[in-house]
């Protein structure tokens, strides 16, 4: 297959939770980037003809037994290498420097002083804020390397061997908290690697359509359509690639938002002229979920049931070989990789039955949410679909904490509709990354009229973010929150209290379950 771009920077995954962000930041510069496991061979890399290689961070100690390594022949390819955190320590070990446990671990913001203006720090200030996350540090750089930056706790915060185009930083430039992190990555891509920045979403569409046609051939594809941004973009992209070889199946599992089922059918069946089959499986899903309160178990049940329903319905259709899903990079990250810890399993990733008979097509699994929106716009999908609020595959099933009942679902459905209506009225719907209501598994005492009540509490979650990997709670004006709270308490039965979640990610995730 033709390579997507003549210039590419490959990121090797050593297990850090933010590794895919590095790939994302490089793409933002107009340079195509892919993430590959640290086990990739030098020969495989050579065939890819990368302009540069980045070694990611990771949770291990470079000197520990069994710590992930890379093919040592990678250092002989003559390709520029940037080591980030663990990646720099690995490079240090390889070239004979010394890595040891830090006396004082550094987690969070720190100030570094630049002592050597290598190409990586070209045009950047001497003092700058970076995001540290390390328990080890470099005690002695390898021969040929110069210390570029330091601080009192980290004598080698950055280093370089410019003769061989090797660079390393002991902080995370890919995280927004690093003040000039984007500039460093830009310097690496352009000043060090010599990239020109000619990659775009149009290139991505061309590549994915080619991949889809090559993978599918003359066979049929069944698309899991939910009406959310991800599955909508997948459906339109695949339909653009193979036309009537695509059949969309929309399962109403009883865990959808208010009015969502009707909206999906109108948008895709009528608006895009796609073949959409609607399946009413509400009773089946709720029956399986009865009495289940553990969030992981709920996710697994919903994920499995989705596939089983698809298989049953697909068996009624002719020759369905492929299943398309809207899995994103963030789904894969949070479900864990070979070297990263699992945060939560995603129904698109961890909930699939082992005996599934479909071959998967996941054209968005290298994209972040904001990239998916850009892709949707590029494909001509209307704004009301592209900017629809993100909705998890398990639906309201993970916004009802604890056991799911019809009553609880109705509370979340109605309160969420009020929240979305008022956020849009206030003109905040494009400013806030994601907003929804959740129902904690708790009741509290209240007074309505002259009577004592003992009813549910509704939680409001609203966050600002760029890519969903990190987020901050949205500063919604108090008067808007007051209107939302008043309406929910007055209009939604069995609710007497509304609370606002002001936790960032991390430490919390965006969804409550």
Curated annotation (Swiss-Prot):
It catalyses: XMP + L-glutamine + ATP + H2O = GMP + L-glutamate + AMP + diphosphate + 2 H(+). It is an enzyme of class 6 (ligase). Residues 199-388 form the GMPS ATP-PPase domain. The keyword Ligase applies. Residues 8-198 form the Glutamine amidotransferase type-1 domain. Pathway: Purine metabolism; GMP biosynthesis; GMP from XMP (L-Gln route): step 1/1. GO terms for molecular function: ATP binding; GMP synthase activity. The active site is at residues 85, 174. ATP binds at residues 226-232. GO terms for cellular component: cytosol. Pfam families: GATase (PF00117), GMP_synt_C (PF00958), NAD_synthase (PF02540). Catalyzes the synthesis of GMP from XMP. Homodimer. This is Putative GMP synthase [glutamine-hydrolyzing]. It comes from Halalkalibacterium halodurans (strain ATCC BAA-125 / DSM 18197 / FERM 7344 / JCM 9153 / C-125).
């Amino acid at each position: 297959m033709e390579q997507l771009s003549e210039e590419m920077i490959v990121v090797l995954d050593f297990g850090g939770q933010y590794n895919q962000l590095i790939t994302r930041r490089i793409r933002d510069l107009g340079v195509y980037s892919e993430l590959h496991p640290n086990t990739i061979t030098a020969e495989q890399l050579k065939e890819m003809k990368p302009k540069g290689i980045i070694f990611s961070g990771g949770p291990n100690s470079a000197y520990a037994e069994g710590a992930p390594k890379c093919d040592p022949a990678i250092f002989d390819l003559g390709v520029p290498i940037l080591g980030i955190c663990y990646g720099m320590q690995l490079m240090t070990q390889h070239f004979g420097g010394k890595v040891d446990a830090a006396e004082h671990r550094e987690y969070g913001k720190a100030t570094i002083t630049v002592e050597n203006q290598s190409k990586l720090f070209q045009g950047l200030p001497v003092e700058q804020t970076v995001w540290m996350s390390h328990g080890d540090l470099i005690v002695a750089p390898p021969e040929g390397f110069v210390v570029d930056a330091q601080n009192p706790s980290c004598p080698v915060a950055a280093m370089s061997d410019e003769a061989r185009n090797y660079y390393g930083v002991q902080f995370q430039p890919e995280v927004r908290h690093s003040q000039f992190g984007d500039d460093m990555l830009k310097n690496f891509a352009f000043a060090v690697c010599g990239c020109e920045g000619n990659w775009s979403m149009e290139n991505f569409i061309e590549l994915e359509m080619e991949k889809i046609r090559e993978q599918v051939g003359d066979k049929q594809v069944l698309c899991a359509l939910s009406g959310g941004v991800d599955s909508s973009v997948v459906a339109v992209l695949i339909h653009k690639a193979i036309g009537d070889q695509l059949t969309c199946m929309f399962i109403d599992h009883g865990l959808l938002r208010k009015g969502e089922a009707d909206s999906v059918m109108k948008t895709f069946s009528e608006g895009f002229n796609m073949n959409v089959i609607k399946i009413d499986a509400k009773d089946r899903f709720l029956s399986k979920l009865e009495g289940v309160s553990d969030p992981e178990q709920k996710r697994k049940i919903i994920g499995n049931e989705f596939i089983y329903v698809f298989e049953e319905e697909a068996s009624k259709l002719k020759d369905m070989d492929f299943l398309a899903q809207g899995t994103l990079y963030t789904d894969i990250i949070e479900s864990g990789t070979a070297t990263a810890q699992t945060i939560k399993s995603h129904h698109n990733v961890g909930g699939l039955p082992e005996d599934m008979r479909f071959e998967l097509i996941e054209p968005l699994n290298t994209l972040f949410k904001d990239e998916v929106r850009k892709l949707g716009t590029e494909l001509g999908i209307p704004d009301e679909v592209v900017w629809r609020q993100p909705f998890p595959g398990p639906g309201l099933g993970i916004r009802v904490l604890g056991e799911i009942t019809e009553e609880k679902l109705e509370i979340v459905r109605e309160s969420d509709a009020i929240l979305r209506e008022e956020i849009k009225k206030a003109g905040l719907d494009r400013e806030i990354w994601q907003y929804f209501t959740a129902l904690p598994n708790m009741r509290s005492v209240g007074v309505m009229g002259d009577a004592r009540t003992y009813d549910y509490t509704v939680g409001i979650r609203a966050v600002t973010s760029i890519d969903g990997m990190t987020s901050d709670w949205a500063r919604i004006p108090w008067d808007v929150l007051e209107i939302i709270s008043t309406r929910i308490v007055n209009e939604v039965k069995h609710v007497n209290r509304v609370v606002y979640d002001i936790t960032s990610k991390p430490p919390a995730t965006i969804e409550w379950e």
